[in-house]
């Protein structure tokens, strides 16, 4: 037996659609999927070039493509298109391991920090199509890293900060990452996680990695390879706060994400 809980009126009044509108949208999505998704893509995404085909499906070959011919950038859609109306509004609310550790990041701040890292990555030779491993704690810089990669067309691969050096190494090698973004240490449930040490151990068999960009999370001393490693703060400090986005095809890869086989 199930219970139905009615949505409070003060919340229902702020919903984008009502049940009748939802039913109509759902019906269209089933009966006219290309029309439906074309309307959604035009409404909610900023395109630099419109698509030629909404969807192309070959069930015999198992090939599916969306919005072929269209061009856009995920970073500009996540940040830039919101700036005219929301520059001073909060984009990210971050809370650290301790509830007292908190920060609110506006869209303008997010834009500038993402652009600074994007410029820093370009300075380190990262370009469109390159793979970047992100092995970080839950800090704002993790979001900046993903968005900065998207801005320059690099393909990011997020690896959970609780994974072992061997698991990290496997993912770096398989995805052919040449750059790693990490932190000196992470803090999880009051426990220190030796991220940079894990990265160094993982890279003992990853000869193609040429850059390790490290955020100072705890400030504790960590192993350092001056020929390869650079502090995140030093890389981004003097970078311009604007960065031209790379124009990407709709079917270009955005990220590589490995399952732990437990989900």
Model-identified regions with their sequence ranges:
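Adenylate-forming
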Residues: 29, 79-83, 110, 114, ...
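Conserved AMP-binding/adenylate-forming core of the ANL superfamily
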Residues: 75, 92-147, 164-169, 228-234
